[in-house]
């Protein structure tokens, strides 16, 4: 039978029907998905959220309104994710509305460490991260104030009361005697130099606190060794705020502060002083008659010198930032202005800041770019802090301004210097032993400086296509600071007249300094979750190059009639009769640091963790034989909470981890090129032949090398009730070897008899404990507490190359009176800077006997051999921090307490001014401490030995309330887009201490510290 062939129209019809069937099937399987992704809190669209079909590479991101379109199939699962939100998985639908909920824990779990980041649960070293919302509140103008008292093991010692003054930071005490003890500061991946430009107290002082997102404090060597030769004193990593993916938001912060200089020295007023001097000196004697004549020059005059120099301080801090996403570009831009009028007249500080951050992504998010640029201008009008002591002890019976006083020998205007009253021994002949009029110290000297700083970097992180577990990271950065300024003392002032070389002509000092730091880092990072063996591995290896360049110019000249401040040099012009500008040669120097580094993080079953790092540094500061140093570290951690046998305990315990670490770090913050034989130009004032044309060799140390610190650390992290209660306990021990010390060398073996060499060692150990708790949590009320305590001890174990029981140690600290009275020493067996004093003699009633100290060696004479090491030092044995935060509905109240126990201060102000003998044959008369004289009864001129007596060594332990803040948070004010917070705060609320000086938190030797004011602030924060 023949088969009938289909004709052409039939074929076409059949093909058409088949096509329709396949099309219907395809339409049934394919789905065009449209949707909106919203923020669960604000309801706003989330820009840049990832929308992906699960199990495929088919995906997109949301647009500026949070909308997206995607092709999918029936039954597909759509995965929606974005940083800071909980990931959602939903069935595909033609129309989708997705609400993302906040997942702040996801962000909390990531901690920034050196050259990367790690989940908090995977940390094996001693690391503390402080987020913006956890930082101290109130009138904060310097970054270190944000974390004061917050971190166990970190001591933040406030600067004096001057505007713009910075603090001193110490992590687990210092590791050096003659090199730096400052921690390494890393800002957005740039390690910055600690030797800040003149006019800037530390490396942080030019950073706007409002720009800071997080602080990460690395304390033990297993965490810090990745920074090698600069990490012996710990590391503080600062990340600044970045652009966001959401809609553009504007934030404005404003605060106004009043500063009260409430602390005063307790001295006599004019009437008390006249009476005391009259009672002290007998009438009819040469000394008594001279004293009476001086206090009766102006019988009706009464001056409160402390009131004369102090003023109420006022400050304002204004900051505005704009953050969001413009097109594909997340960005943040900020501007800041801070203006402080100090509590001592003439003092003033201004800071202008600007920052820009851009953080775009390219190539399907494979290339992430971070661009950061920060600029700062600091302007400082410095007041002479010596005016504090001068005001306390200047004769209260004398006027501020010069009075036309007749003298039988010298005529009129005997005591008038440029309009200010000052002590004189003759016409235009100042008394060189007396202090200047306190107001003259402030107004006859113009001392000002300006520092301009720019800090920036561009960081590229590329996720390799086809090998997404491998990242390549390149970071190129810079830090440049230029400081200019000078001081000028006016002609005719007491200060210029007191200078025997220049008499009454003006004089000045000019500086012009440059600090430049260039950085290049490159590293590869491979991270892989190997499910088959229940392991996570993260390997990083890299290279770093850093160049530091410094240029300093400082010129001292006389016979000037104006403040030449920022001019770069002067030369004398005979025609004009004064110094004029000329070109001077500055003194530049530089050094390089080249490094290779690597790190391995490995975890098994999320229970057993290993971290190992290795860094090799090469520094041009050292000779070729000692140029390279190797700095290894290793840490193990056991996440006990993840063990099966802890399953029942997890109802109560949320974290339990044991950590053990060891590592070696270095110290290279020393003077450059001490190993080289340098030649210096002779002084042009020398009487030697050839004078300034003579080149002479300096001493050198060819074998100089790194100071090295080996650190052991054991820690336990704990958490209860879903980490509602959490904290850690740490024990650490640091052993530093090859400490730098100045030692003698054999005659003829060098160009000097003393050189710097690596001969010392020191031991440092301590315990840390901290606890954080949400004590109460209800719908409307919460109470959060944080407490930390650190115990620390340090001891020098070696100071010479070979054992020498007769070695007397190194002089470490001196008072400024006399020719510089030594009060502290570094000595083997004692803490660094231990006080070295004479032992005071007391009578049978327990009263100190003036100018009587113990002859401890019984040789019949009082010499320095009778001094003893007191076993007391300025370092605290224990320091603590306590923070508390109450929240009720929209109200919040918080405070911060800080304590220091076991620290001692030598009260040199009392030692120098604690005797009733205000007048002698020196031709001037001074006030004195009332309470000191009342307690000791001293009436004679104190001897040099008396001024170095342990009588004036005081326990300076203290408890301070640094801050208390009350705030109210509001939302939807006038419009749904306006929210914010208003606050009132008090800083330096109270201090509890037995110390008799103005403030126990001062340098080891207290000589007229500029008192810290109590401040009252009002602030407002607005978010648009």
Please state what every model-predicted region is.
Residues 243-248, 327-329, 363-369, 384, ...:
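Short loop/turn motifs that connect adjacent beta-strands in outer-membrane beta-barrel proteins
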Residues 271-301, 390-440, 491-506, 551-583, ...:
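Surface-exposed loop/turn segments flanking beta-strands in extracellular/periplasmic regions
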Residues 342-355, 366, 372-376, 382-384, ...:
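Small-side-chain secondary-structure face that scaffolds active or pore-lining regions
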Residues 1-376, 384-385, 428-429, 455-456, ...:
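Short, small/polar-rich motifs associated with maturation and membrane association
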């Amino acid at each position: 039978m023949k088969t009938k062939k289909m004709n052409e129209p039939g074929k076409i019809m059949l093909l058409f029907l088949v096509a329709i069937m396949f099309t219907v099937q395809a339409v049934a399987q394919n789905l065009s998905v449209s949707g909106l992704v919203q923020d669960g809190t604000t309801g706003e669209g989330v820009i840049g959220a990832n929308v992906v079909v699960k199990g495929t590479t088919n995906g997109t991101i949301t647009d500026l309104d949070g909308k997206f379109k995607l092709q999918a199939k029936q039954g597909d699962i759509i995965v929606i994710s974005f940083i800071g939100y909980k990931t959602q998985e939903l069935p595909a639908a033609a129309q989708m509305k997705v609400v993302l909920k906040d997942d702040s824990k996801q962000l909390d779990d990531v901690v920034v460490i050196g050259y990367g980041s790690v989940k908090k649960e995977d940390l094996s070293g001693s690391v503390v991260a402080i987020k913006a919302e956890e930082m101290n509140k109130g009138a904060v103008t310097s970054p270190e104030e944000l974390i004061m008292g917050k971190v166990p093991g970190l001591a933040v010692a406030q600067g004096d009361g001057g505007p713009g003054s910075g603090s001193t930071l110490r992590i687990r005490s210092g590791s050096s005697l003659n090199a730096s003890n400052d921690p390494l500061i890393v800002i957005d991946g740039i390690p910055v130099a600690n030797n800040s430009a003149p006019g800037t107290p530390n490396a942080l002082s030019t950073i706007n606190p409002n720009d800071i997102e997080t602080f990460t404090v690395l304390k033990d060597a297993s965490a810090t060794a990745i920074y090698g030769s600069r990490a012996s004193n710990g590391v503080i990593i600062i990340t600044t705020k970045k652009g966001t993916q959401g809609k553009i938001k504007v934030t404005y912060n404003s605060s106004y502060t009043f500063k009260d200089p409430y602390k005063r020295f307790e001295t006599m007023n004019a009437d008390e002083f006249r009476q005391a001097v009259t009672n002290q000196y007998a009438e009819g004697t040469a000394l008594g008659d001279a004293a009476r004549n001086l206090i009766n020059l102006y019988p009706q005059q009464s001056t409160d010198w402390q009131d004369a120099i102090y003023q109420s301080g006022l400050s304002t801090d204004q900051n505005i930032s704009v953050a969001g996403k413009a097109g594909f570009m997340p960005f943040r831009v900020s501007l800041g202005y801070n203006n402080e009028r100090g509590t001592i007249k003439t003092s003033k500080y201004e800071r202008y800041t600007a920052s820009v951050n851009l953080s775009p992504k390219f190539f399907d998010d494979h290339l992430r770019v971070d661009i950061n640029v920060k600029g700062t201008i600091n302007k400082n009008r410095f007041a002479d802090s010596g005016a504090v002591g001068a005001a306390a002890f200047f004769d209260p019976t004398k006027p501020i301004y010069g009075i036309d006083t007749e003298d039988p020998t010298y005529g009129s205007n005997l005591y008038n210097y440029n309009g200010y009253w000052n002590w004189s021994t003759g016409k235009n002949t100042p008394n060189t032993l007396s202090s200047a009029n306190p107001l003259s110290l402030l107004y006859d000297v113009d001392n000002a400086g300006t520092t301009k700083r720019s800090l920036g970097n561009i960081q590229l992180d590329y996720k390799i296509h086809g090998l997404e577990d491998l990242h390549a990271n390149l970071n190129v950065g810079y830090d440049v600071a230029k400081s200019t300024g000078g001081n000028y003392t006016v002609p005719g002032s007491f200060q210029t007249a007191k200078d025997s070389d220049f008499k009454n002509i003006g004089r000045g000092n000019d500086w012009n300094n440059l600090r430049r730091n260039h950085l290049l880092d490159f590293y590869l990072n491979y991270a892989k979750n190997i499910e088959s063996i229940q392991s996570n591995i993260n390997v990083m290896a890299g290279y770093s190059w850093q160049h530091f360049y410094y240029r300093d110019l400082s010129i001292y000249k006389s016979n000037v009639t104006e403040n030449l401040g920022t001019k770069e040099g002067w030369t004398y012009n005979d025609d004009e009769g004064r110094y004029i500008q000329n070109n001077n040669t500055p003194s530049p120097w530089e050094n390089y640091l080249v490094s290779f580094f690597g790190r391995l993080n490995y975890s098994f079953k999320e229970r057993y963790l290993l971290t190992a790092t290795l860094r090799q540094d090469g520094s041009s500061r050292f000779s070729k034989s000692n140029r390279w140093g190797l700095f290894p570290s290793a840490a193990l951690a056991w996440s006990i909470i993840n063990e099966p046998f802890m399953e029942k305990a997890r109802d109560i315990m949320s974290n339990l981890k044991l950590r053990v670490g060891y590592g070696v770090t270095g110290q290279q913050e020393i003077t450059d090129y001490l190993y080289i034989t340098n030649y210096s130009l002779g002084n042009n004032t020398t009487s030697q032949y050839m004078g300034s044309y003579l080149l002479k060799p300096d001493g050198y140390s060819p074998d100089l090398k790194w100071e090295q610190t080996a650190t052991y650390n054991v820690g336990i992290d704990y958490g209860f009730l879903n980490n509602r209660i959490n904290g850690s306990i740490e024990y650490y021990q640091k052993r530093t070897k090859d400490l730098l010390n100045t030692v003698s060398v054999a005659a003829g073996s060098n160009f000097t008899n003393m050189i710097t060499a690596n001969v010392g060692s020191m031991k440092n150990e301590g315990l840390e404990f901290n606890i954080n708790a949400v004590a109460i949590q209800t719908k409307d009320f919460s109470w959060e507490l944080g407490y930390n305590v650190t115990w620390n001890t340090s001891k020098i174990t070696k100071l010479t190359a070979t054992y020498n029981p007769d070695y007397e140690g190194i002089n470490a600290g001196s008072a400024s009176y006399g020719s510089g009275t030594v009060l502290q020493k570094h000595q083997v067996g004692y803490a660094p800077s231990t006080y070295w004093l004479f032992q005071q003699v007391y009578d049978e009633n327990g009263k100190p006997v003036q100018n009587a100290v113990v002859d401890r060696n019984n040789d019949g004479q009082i010499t320095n051999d009778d001094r003893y090491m007191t076993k007391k030092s300025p370092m605290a044995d224990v320091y603590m921090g306590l923070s508390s935060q109450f929240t009720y509905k929209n109200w919040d109240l918080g405070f911060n307490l800080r304590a220091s126990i076991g620290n001692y201060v030598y009260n040199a102000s009392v030692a120098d001014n604690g005797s009733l003998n205000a007048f002698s044959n020196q031709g001037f008369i001074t006030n004195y401490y009332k309470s000191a004289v009342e307690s000791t009864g001293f009436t004679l001129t104190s001897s040099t030995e008396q001024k170095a007596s342990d009588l004036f060594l005081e326990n300076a332990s203290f408890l301070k309330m640094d801050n208390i803040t009350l705030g109210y948070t509001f939302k939807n004010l006038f419009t749904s887009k306006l929210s914010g917070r208003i606050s009132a705060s008090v800083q330096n609320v109270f201090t509890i201490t037995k110390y008799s000086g103005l403030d126990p938190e001062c340098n080891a030797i207290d000589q007229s510290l500029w008192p810290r004011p109590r401040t009252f602030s009002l602030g407002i924060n607005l978010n648009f």
